Amino acid sequence: MPRTDDDSWEITESVGATALGVAAARAAETESENPLISDPFARVFLDAAGDGMWNWFAAPNLPAQIAEAEPDLKPRMQGMVDYMAARTAFFDNFFLAATRAGVRQVVILAAGLDSRAWRLPFEDGTTVYELDQPRVLEFKATTLAEYGARPTCHLVSVPVDLRHDWPAALRQAGFDAHAPSAWSAEGLLPFLPAAAQQLLFERVQTLAAPGSRIAVEAPGPDFLDEAARERQRQTMQRVRDLMADLEPDRDIPDVQDLWYFEEREDVGDWLGRHGWDVTVTPAPELMARYDRRPPHDIEDATPQTRFVAAQRTERTRPDR
């Protein structure tokens, strides 16, 4: 279903379902023979959510009819698991480095089913602020509480739509804009219109004191490539048609219906112009760094995103 300006969702629908797909990829990596990351809670979320297309990533085998009709699908799915593993490791290492350097405020924008507040060994005194839709955060908190999980930090949930006045909600939750902070925007930007992305970073700029850090998964140069989008859409349509015959009650959303394909400023360029020291790593380079490589003989097997890491150095104080 196409997006609307004020849409909201449960964890099993629309944008929420994509968080379950990512959790399934983390579960698959965690349960693999040589995992790059460990997320013991990913499987917990899947079990709580029940059956859905997100379980494909975590399942050892596809239905035989689909595997035979779409032989590229399984290596594509493994490529996405490898991509998500590298992405997760990138943000894990970013946050751990920031807190080891003395940063004690962590802000996770559109936290979804991110479980870092429960699984990373944060330094003592670290506060993690998780921002997302109220029903998404409620599902996560309830699921982990029933499982008996406890945060490894001081966790503050901030139930707010990022299209609304989230800076006010963050401040009211205790965030100190005059102390350094570490921010993440992981799997977020394509779900925002270009104007909303611009506003997001402008707001971060008002809240991030000198010494703050940010990590971003940013759309790559092929994000607006219509030919690539059409190839991906046709592949998924064939899978939907096959699935409709096998399991007519299982819905497979088209993630492209949830994204905003609009021209937008390069994230690294924007941060560089606003007083941040920036490092940009293309996705293939990041995957190779972690010894994860996309299938070489399948076009568009993994996202051609860019991973941006930056630290604010200029001395302008954040707005009061």
UniProtKB/Swiss-Prot annotation:
Function, as annotated: Exhibits S-adenosyl-L-methionine-dependent methyltransferase activity.
Catalytic activity, EC: 2.1.1.-
Source organism: Mycobacterium avium (strain 104)
Family: Belongs to the UPF0677 family.
Single biological process term from Gene Ontology: methylation
One Gene Ontology term of the molecular function aspect: methyltransferase activity
Protein name: Putative S-adenosyl-L-methionine-dependent methyltransferase MAV_4558
Record has Iron-sulfur as a keyword: no
Key words of the record: Methyltransferase, S-adenosyl-L-methionine, Transferase
Pfam entry (one): LCM
Signal peptide range: none
Residues given in the record as S-adenosyl-L-methionine binding sites: D132, D161, L162
